[in-house]
């Protein structure tokens, strides 16, 4: 049968492309990571250096475990800082309550020597749920699904793919040759190459199946208050609470408004309240010390004043109680003054709480869903006599986030200022990572200065494999910290949005740093763009076949080994946090300040960064599980150790976080990128080794294209589903559900304050105990008591949704 003209043209173009890339029948293995001649770094060694790297990494892991055990037992309760943190920081899930606190202490004492090690295996999900919240349970459930997936992948890769690769005879017969275990060992005319593509498709379906099972297990207990509260942006800054309430009453007469809260800028007030709280704790500390010892303590409150050995001008000592009393009075004056100016700083935001969830859903649908009439689609909400005054057509309406998810101090940063700040931070971040994205640039620089020439004859695997993979892990560990702090500077309105953006950015940068650029043999994004766009560059024809060099897979196997042992060991030790902790303890001016540092050292678990880092390694494992099946069991070891370390850290180290479920679904979507990249790798192999017209290449291309189209369709429908009214399920009001529903009426609405301000509110207002226990959005209830009869409930940092900021 004659070939079609389309395939003839396709084949000619493919041959032309392969000729431009300088590809022959076999890959050119004279270069991979460095194009410099006679490079002494990253050259092939016995079995890719894997045995040596494994031995060194396991030894380092045991050493890190020993160091952590000593530090945890001897210094500052460092290994369980979440348990010694102040109770106010943990009130979100009633941590350190009378029951759970005593239970925790019994648990610690019961385990005896090295309790943290056995606690990893003895902890139950119920304990983690009570102590750490729902998000920790979903995160650990995600890891367990990844573990089961990698068990299946490891079994198939070792029992099917590895024997197939070993059956080839293209490379040396040396049993110590790592290349014999890779797909590069098979001849191009070997029909067994079809098996690799079929198993890549199987891995894709397995990943989809396991991830779907995980998403079905994600069950969030929606807060009644959250689901019946709407967050509104785009309000005129001079809008009044009564006007907004009248608008909803007139436009939606069937929807009963419980409360309307306007949002004001309280960022400075929150900061002052935090400082006042620290000062009060220090004052209490020295007051109790005086009662106990009968003597007043002298301190030197100047920076590094504790290191002054004598009293000189500018370094005088003073009474601790007098100093902190004076600081407290000064802060109270500033808080009182700031409260008086709060209402002069409106944010143009509000949140409205309704009697029923169905009412909030109905209004959200009216504002967001496109309603088509004839040939026109419009989204104008129902009008009222106040619509023009309130500019309702410019409103952005979303469901409100949980109050614990709000970054209260960031609400004042919005509109053009927010976008300019975001662009500036990310442009600077991109420039910084543009020229330094993989440690290969350091290795090539070492070659230029002949640093490694003396060991050229040794061909030592410690130099050629251990240090490069250690450098790669070090850079991949540093990058999340850089992206983390840059994301904090972006001033997101919710912690969920902050974590989701962080996860996306870290994952993309890590995939480029760890997988794509090293696979292509590129040293940085600078070279990547030059290779991509500069057709006259000498590097433009020498990169793609680097993906399938025999020793290429060994580099990634060693990286996964380093991540499994050194990475998880360092994550348990948390060396950057330990250094910061030590620095803060040294710089604390007084013993009371050091006590405050110790109690405020615990932070919330950054699910976004941790998801991204774990998914990066998972993507490397799956992407090379076909071309280099040896990587799969080491990947399983990595995720098992990661799971145990995270169980320990979530329970003993980090404070619980209250996030939206969107971040867990985003992690599932990113996990699906792993088998897609595996298909990409097989397609590149088929294209470079077999040609475009080969049946295996065409089949892989069609599967890959279909997968990408399905993912794009899913993403697009997910992005635009709010335009369809069918996606807003309206529940029946309680009055239509009978007496059974009436028994579950929502509790009465009572204003609520941000956590840091709640203590002041309870101290200075006459709120009843029942009122203090109920949660709502945004209010500051006459904290200072300086404005008699006036409630500053409107001067609130309102609840926000995890939506992008509007100008």
Swiss-Prot record:
Keywords associated with the record: Calcium, Cell membrane, Disease variant, Endosome, Glycoprotein, Ion channel, Ion transport, Leukodystrophy, Lysosome, Membrane, Phosphoprotein, Transmembrane, Transmembrane helix, Transport
Record's keyword annotation contains tRNA processing: no
GO molecular function, one term: calcium-activated cation channel activity
Mutagenesis or variant effect for residue 462 to N: In HLD19; loss of mechanosensitive ion channel activity
Record-linked SUPFAM superfamilies: RNA-binding domain, RBD
Transmembrane segments: 52-74, 135-167, 192-217, 417-444, 463-490, 496-532, 555-586, 607-624, 629-651, 662-689, 695-709
Catalytic activity: Ca(2+)(in) = Ca(2+)(out)
Function in brief: Mechanosensitive cation channel with low conductance and high activation threshold. In contrast to TMEM63B, does not show phospholipid scramblase activity. Acts as a regulator of lysosomal morphology by mediating lysosomal mechanosensitivity. Important for the baby's first breath and respiration throughout life. Upon lung inflation conducts cation currents in alveolar type 1 and 2 cells triggering lamellar body exocytosis and surfactant secretion into airspace. Also acts as an osmosensitive cation channel preferentially activated by hypotonic stress.
Entry protein name: Mechanosensitive cation channel TMEM63A
Species per Swiss-Prot/TrEMBL record: Homo sapiens (Human)
């Amino acid at each position: 049968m004659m070939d079609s003209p389309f395939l003839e043209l396709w084949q000619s173009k493919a041959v032309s492309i392969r000729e431009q890339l300088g590809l022959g029948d076999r890959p050119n293995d004279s270069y991979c990571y460095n194009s410099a001649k006679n490079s002494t770094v990253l050259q092939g060694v016995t079995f890719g250096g894997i045995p040596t790297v494994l031995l060194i990494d396991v030894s380092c892991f045991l050493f890190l475990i020993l160091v952590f055990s000593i530090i945890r037992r001897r210094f500052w309760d460092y290994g369980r800082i979440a348990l010694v943190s102040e109770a106010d920081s943990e009130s979100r899930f009633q941590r350190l309550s009378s029951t759970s606190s005593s239970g925790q202490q019994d648990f610690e004492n019961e385990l005896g020597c090295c309790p943290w090690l056995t606690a990893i295996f003895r902890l139950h999900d119920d304990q983690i749920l009570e102590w750490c919240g729902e998000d920790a349970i979903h995160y650990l459930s995600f890891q367990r699904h990844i573990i089961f997936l990698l068990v299946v992948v490891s079994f198939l890769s070792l029992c099917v793919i590895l024997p197939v690769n070993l059956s080839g005879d293209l490379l040396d017969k040396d049993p110590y040759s790592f290349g014999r275990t890779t797909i590069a060992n098979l001849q191009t005319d070997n029909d067994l190459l079809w098996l690799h593509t079929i198993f890549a498709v199987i891995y894709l379906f397995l990943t989809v199946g396991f991830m779907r099972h995980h998403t079905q297990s994600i069950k969030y207990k929606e807060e009644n208050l959250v689901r019946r509260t709407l967050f509104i942006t785009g309000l005129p800054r001079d809008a009044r609470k009564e006007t907004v309430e009248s608008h909803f009453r007139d436009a939606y007469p069937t929807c009963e408004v419980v409360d309307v809260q306007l949002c004001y800028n309280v960022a400075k007030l929150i900061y002052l309240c935090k400082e006042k709280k620290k000062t009060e704790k220090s004052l209490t500390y020295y007051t109790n010390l005086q009662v106990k010892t009968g003597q007043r303590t002298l301190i030197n409150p100047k920076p590094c004043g504790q290191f002054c050995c004598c009293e000189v001008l500018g370094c005088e000592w003073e009474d601790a109680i007098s100093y902190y009393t004076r600081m407290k009075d000064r802060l109270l004056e500033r808080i009182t003054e700031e409260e008086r100016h709060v209402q002069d700083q409106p944010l143009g935001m509000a949140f409205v709480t309704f009697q029923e969830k169905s009412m909030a859903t109905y209004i959200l649908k009216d504002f967001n869903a496109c309603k088509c009439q004839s040939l026109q689609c419009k989204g104008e909400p129902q009008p009222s006599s106040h619509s023009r005054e309130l500019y309702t057509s410019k409103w952005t309406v979303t469901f409100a986030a949980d109050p614990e998810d709000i970054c209260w101090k960031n609400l004042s940063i919005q509109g053009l200022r927010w976008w300019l700040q975001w662009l500036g931070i990310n442009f600077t971040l991109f420039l910084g990572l543009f020229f330094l994205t993989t440690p290969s640039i350091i290795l090539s620089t070492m070659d230029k200065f002949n640093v490694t020439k003396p060991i050229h004859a040794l061909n030592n695997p410690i130099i050629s494999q251990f240090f490069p993979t250690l450098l790669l892990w070090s850079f991949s560990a540093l990058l999340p910290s850089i992206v983390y702090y840059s994301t904090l500077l972006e001033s997101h309105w919710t912690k969920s949005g902050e974590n989701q953006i962080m996860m996306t950015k870290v994952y993309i940068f890590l995939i480029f740093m760890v997988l794509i650029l090293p696979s292509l043999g590129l040293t940085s994004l600078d070279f990547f763009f030059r290779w991509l766009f500069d057709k006259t560059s000498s590097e433009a024809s020498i990169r793609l076949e680097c993906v399938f060099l025999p020793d290429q897979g060994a580099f990634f196997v060693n990286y996964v080994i380093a991540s499994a042992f050194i990475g998880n060991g360092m994550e348990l030790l948390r060396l950057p946090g330990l250094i910061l902790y030590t620095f803060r303890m040294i710089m604390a001016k007084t013993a009371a300040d050091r006590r405050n540092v110790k109690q405020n050292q615990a932070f919330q678990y950054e699910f976004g960064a941790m998801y991204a880092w774990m998914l990066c390694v998972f993507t490397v494992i799956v992407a090379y599980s076909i071309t280099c099946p040896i990587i799969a069991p080491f990947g399983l070891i990595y995720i098992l150790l990661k799971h145990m370390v995270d169980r320990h850290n979530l329970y003993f180290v980090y404070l619980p976080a209250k996030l939206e479920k969107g971040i867990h679904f985003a992690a599932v979507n990113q996990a699906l990128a792993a088998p897609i990249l595996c298909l990409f790798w097989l397609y590149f192999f088929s294209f470079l080794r077999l040609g475009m017209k080969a049946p295996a290449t065409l089949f892989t291309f069609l599967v890959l294209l279909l997968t990408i189209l399905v993912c794009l369709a899913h993403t697009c429908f997910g992005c635009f589903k709010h335009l369809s009214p069918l996606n807003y399920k309206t529940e029946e009001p309680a009055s239509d559900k009978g007496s059974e529903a009436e028994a579950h009426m929502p509790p009465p609405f009572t204003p609520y304050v941000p956590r840091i301000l709640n203590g002041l509110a309870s101290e200075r207002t006459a709120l009843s105990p029942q009122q203090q226990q109920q949660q709502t959005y945004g209010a500051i209830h006459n904290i200072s008591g300086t404005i008699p009869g006036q409630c500053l409930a409107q001067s609130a940092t309102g609840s926000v949704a995890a939506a992008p900021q509007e100008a």
